[in-house]
Amino acid sequence: MTLVDLLAVAVLAAVGTRLFSIARFSLRPGRRAHVVGLIRGIRARHVVPVPFVLAAVLAAALLLMEVPGLDWGWWTALGGFGNPVTGGTERTVGTVFEWLVPLLFVALLLPALPLLAEREEQVFRRGDERRSIPQRAARGLAFGLVHAVMGIPLGAALALSIGGWYFSWCYLRGYRNGNRTQLAALAESTRAHLAYNAFIVALLVVSLIATAGMSG
């Protein structure tokens, strides 16, 4: 096993441990009601735009990653696919672990999705009602770029800014329609973010099932 292999294993172990911790926290009786409330509050307005937003993100990512240097990410440099949170790595291609490890990570990720989305909204969108358009645009860009720290290629991280701008729009919608309170605004953008992430996870699960079927 090479040093790169060891680093990839260490990253997956750290991410898996973190996901387990968040999932366990999400399932505690004191948090479960809050998580269920976020999920039950999802409406068509949160779900319907998701495929269009994802299509825009994907198109932007494909274009940006054609720019030299923007196709680099530290996780891909270690032989990983996409994001360490999905647990994919080229070291497992052709083995049962190609789909088993990502499936285990997804199982841990599912209960954690609502709180992860909520935390990102608290960090990046809270206070958008007081920010100017350029400031909100910069926050959306920061939201995208922070994913580069998590290991995804720079071009893909920049493309995720589109999602950040969409969530900001949802936040402001919630602020206007929710008696101009941050609580209502955060609930609105969190549910939009949760629907977005859940759609991505659903696509990932379909892909993993297909991979498992072909390997079987």
What are the residue ranges of the model-derived segments?
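Juxtamembrane helix-loop-helix connectors linking adjacent transmembrane helices
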Residues: 27-116, 129-131, 210-215
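Short, Lys/Arg-rich N-terminal segment immediately upstream of the first membrane anchor
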Residues: 1, 39-42, 189
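N-terminal signal-anchor/start-transfer transmembrane helix
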Residues: 9-32, 117
